[in-house]
Every structure is written in C-alpha cells, then in structure tokens.
C-alpha cells in the first residue's frame, strides 16, 4: 500500500468537517499592547484556549478518527513531550480507545498529570528517554511488538491536515473582520503546525509571508532546510522549550516547509522567557515556552512588520507553575539583569559589609550568597548573585568586583560553571 506523503487544501477541508464538533473555535484577537509596541496590527490566534490548551488536539483527533474500526480496536500509541499526548488522550477517551502514551522523563509533571486527566482509564503513560527522539524510538518498538497504531505527532498527513484546520478557521475569522495578514508567525517543533498552516495559506492567502520560529537551541528545521537541504538530526538540543525541542523534523514536514515557509527565525530561550513573563503581566496570557515562540520572534522582525498586519499563533498554554522560577531566572540572565561571580572573601568580621558598601550600586540587590568558610585559610570562596536595576550598570559593577577581588570568576560567561552552580 502506498503511503500518502502530501497534504492538500482538500485534506484540510475534510479534516475541518471531522473536527467541527470536537475542537473549540479559538479566538482571533487584536492585541493592543503588541500592536502599540511594534507599530503595527498584531493579532493572536489563541490555541492556548483550546480544550487541551494547545492546537495538538486537531491533528491527534483527525489522525485517529480516520483509522478503520479494526485498527482502532487494536489500540493506539504515541510519543510526545506533552501536548500531542494530551490530544491523543482526549481522543482516546472520546472514542473509547485504549492508548499507551510515551513521554520523555523530562516532561513537566503538569503535562503528565493532564494526560492522565484527559485520558482517564483509557490511557497508560510510560515515561522513558531524556528527549523526544529517545522516547519516540521506544514507542515505535512497543507499537510494532504489540501490533498497535502509532499516531505520529507531526510526520503524518492526517496529523498535518488536522493542524491545518487552524489556518482555515483563522482565515474565516479574519475574512469576517475584513482583515488580511501580511505576516504569519508560528512555532516549529517537528513541523506539523507550520506544514498544515502554510499549505492552506499558500492557496487562500498567498501574499502572507510565513515565518517559522524555532528555539535557538533546537533549530532542526532551519538546519535541515536552509543549511543542509536535507533532513538532519541535531546531536544536541536545549530541551527548555519542551514543546518545540525536536532533534529531527519529519520527512514530510521538511518537504512542505521547504516549499512553503518564507523565512526562519531562531529565538534565544531567554528571550522566550521574557516573552512569557511579558505576556502574563501585560496581557494576562499564560503561554508555555513553545506557545510564546511566535510572539518572541516579533522583536527580530520589528523593522519589517511596522505598519503591517501580523498574526501570531499562540500554540499552547500548558505551562507548569513550578517552572516560573527558572523562567524568571533565564529572562533576567538574557536581559543582562542578573549576574553571578565566584569571589575570595577575607575571613574576618566586616568583610561582607565592605563588599556591600564598596561593590554594590545604590539600586543593586544580592539575590544569592553562599559562603564556604575554610578555617585553615585567610579567605573563603563565595558564590554571589547580583541583580541590577539597569543592565547598563554591568560595566561599572564588573570594575568594582575586579577591584575587590582581581581573581574573581564571572559565572555568566562560563556555561559549565553556571549549570553546576546555579
């Protein structure tokens, strides 16, 4: 049997009919804060408000619903960092199917619990592997051994068609408001979302520039399409943006993206964190890291989008509240507002007071202080974190630190030390 490897607008239209009573029609909102910030009209497609708080339900339900009754009776499997798993779990419960869901051991607990909640007794969750790609290998082996049906999170035409219904829905909403998009920004993980959206836009909104956004530590589509002109596997990835951290994109999504995507933007994970905090404080939007990617990319494109009409897909809102401290930390480091040093402190009374008086600026704050006292020596090693009010104060801070201890180590510039100590 020939496996279908292309997606058409007809496929997306058919998927739209399957999903119309299953998924929520999520809002397309004009965002006044971002519009003012970038001197353009910025619309947000709020898939973070979907039933499972991400767009993944669209692709999962469509891919499962087209299975034959015989195939459904054998059960389904999937591998996912979280959101696709929730879509599969929701569908399994809705259609009363048995599902075994494989998730990386690094998946935030909030996402694991949500999968169990949506799937209830229809779902078994297996945590395995440090990355999605390791998890995928385990899932495929299990699927083959148990003759079940693997629901691919992105490299499947039915999954892609389901994700493409987001574009059809969005364009219908825009048409009713007489809105035409000049730019569309959407996250890329494995490529299912950008493939589905771009397929529909290239036919029904061909003048819209499609911009794919990846975390800089996992830019597998950019490396495949732009750098190598073939699908490549990244040897190492930063897993922080867990919903978009994939070492290898799909063969199908690669071909579609290569044809349809106009440009790629890589966003630093720290910038994503700043966007998450900004969206929460300014717009009351709770976006997960992958969900904030599209908005993060606007800063890279600010000169191009001025005076234009832009839409950003907020792809998910499954953010674990326990990660907020790390998100704030990464944001402060990216904004050059928090700095860490290793210093030698004199082991005598008053040394800390001297440091505060001589080194700290009037608006600086100590956020971390660990003092290892060595009784046989005159000095002890101190790990100290300092938060600035203005990142422009860094040069003077470094000068004062160097005067206090010329042998100090600036941890921010040493990734290995930072990962070990902070």
Swiss-Prot record:
Its cofactor is pyridoxal 5'-phosphate. Its EC number is 4.3.1.19. Pathway: Amino-acid biosynthesis; L-isoleucine biosynthesis; 2-oxobutanoate from L-threonine: step 1/1. It is an enzyme of class 4 (lyase). Keywords: Amino-acid biosynthesis, Branched-chain amino acid biosynthesis, Isoleucine biosynthesis, Lyase, Pyridoxal phosphate. Pyridoxal 5'-phosphate binds at residues 83, 189-193, 315. The modification N6-(pyridoxal phosphate)lysine is found at residue 56. One of its GO terms (biological process) is threonine metabolic process. It catalyses: L-threonine = 2-oxobutanoate + NH4(+). One of its GO terms (molecular function) is pyridoxal phosphate binding. The keyword Cytoplasm does not apply. The keyword Amino-acid biosynthesis applies. InterPro entries: ACT-like_dom_sf, IlvA, Ser/Thr_Dehydratase, Ser/Thr_deHydtase_PyrdxlP-BS, TD_ACT-like, TD_ACT-like_sf, TrpB-like_PALP, TrpB-like_PALP_sf. It holds the Pfam family Thr_dehydrat_C. Residues 339-413 form the ACT-like domain. Catalyzes the anaerobic formation of alpha-ketobutyrate and ammonia from threonine in a two-step reaction. The first step involved a dehydration of threonine and a production of enamine intermediates (aminocrotonate), which tautomerizes to its imine form (iminobutyrate). Both intermediates are unstable and short-lived. The second step is the nonenzymatic hydrolysis of the enamine/imine intermediates to form 2-ketobutyrate and free ammonia. In the low water environment of the cell, the second step is accelerated by RidA. PANTHER family: THREONINE DEHYDRATASE, MITOCHONDRIAL (PTHR48078:SF11), THREONINE DEHYDRATASE, MITOCHONDRIAL-RELATED (PTHR48078). Homotetramer. Belongs to the serine/threonine dehydratase family. NCBIfam families: PRK08639.1, THD1. This is L-threonine dehydratase biosynthetic IlvA. It comes from Staphylococcus aureus (strain USA300).
């Amino acid at each position: 049997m020939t496996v279908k490897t292309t997606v058409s607008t007809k496929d997306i239209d058919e998927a739209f009919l399957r999903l119309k009573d299953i998924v929520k029609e999520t809002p397309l909102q004009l965002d006044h804060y971002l519009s003012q910030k970038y001197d353009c009209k910025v619309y947000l497609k709020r898939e973070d408000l979907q039933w499972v708080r991400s767009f993944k339900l669209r692709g999962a339900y469509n891919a499962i619903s087209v299975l034959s009754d015989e195939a459904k009776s054998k059960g389904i499997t999937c591998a996912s960092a979280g959101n696709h798993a929730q879509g599969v779990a929701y569908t399994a419960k809705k259609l009363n199917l048995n599902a075994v869901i494989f998730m990386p051991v690094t998946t935030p607990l909030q996402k694991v619990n949500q999968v169990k909640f949506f799937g209830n007794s229809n779902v078994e969750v297996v945590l395995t592997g440090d990355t999605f790609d390791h998890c995928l290998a385990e899932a495929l082996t299990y699927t083959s051994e148990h003759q079940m049906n693997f629901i691919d999170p992105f490299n499947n035409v039915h999954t892609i068609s389901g994700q493409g219904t987001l574009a059809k829905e969005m364009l219908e909403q825009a048409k009713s408001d007489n809105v035409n998009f000049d730019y569309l920004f959407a996250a890329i993980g494995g490529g299912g979302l950008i493939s589905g959206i771009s397929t529909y836009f290239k036919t029904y909104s061909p003048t819209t520039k499609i911009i794919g956004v990846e975390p800089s530590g996992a830019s597998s589509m950019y490396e495949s399409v732009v750098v190598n002109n073939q699908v490549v596997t990244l040897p190492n990835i930063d897993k922080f943006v867990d919903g978009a951290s994939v070492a290898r994109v799909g063969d199908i999504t690669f071909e579609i993206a290569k044809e349809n995507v106009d440009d790629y933007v890589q966003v630093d994970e720290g910038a994503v964190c700043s966007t998450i905090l900004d969206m929460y404080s300014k717009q009351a939007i709770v976006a997960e890291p992958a969900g904030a990617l599209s908005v993060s990319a606007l800063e890279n494109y600010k000169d191009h989008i001025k005076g234009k009409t832009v839409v950003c897909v907020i792809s998910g809102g499954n953010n674990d509240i326990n990660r907020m401290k790390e998100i704030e930390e990464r944001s402060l480091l990216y904004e050059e507002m928090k700095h860490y040093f290793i210093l030698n402190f004199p082991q005598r009374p008053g040394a800390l007071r001297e440091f505060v008086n001589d080194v700290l600026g009037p608006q600086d704050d100590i956020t971390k202080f660990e003092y290892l006292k060595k009784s046989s020596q005159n000095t002890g090693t101190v790990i100290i974190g300092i938060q600035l009010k203005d990142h422009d104060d860094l040069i003077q801070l470094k000068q004062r630190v160097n005067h206090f201890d010329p042998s100090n180590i600036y941890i921010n510039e040493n990734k290995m030390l930072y990962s070990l100590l902070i």
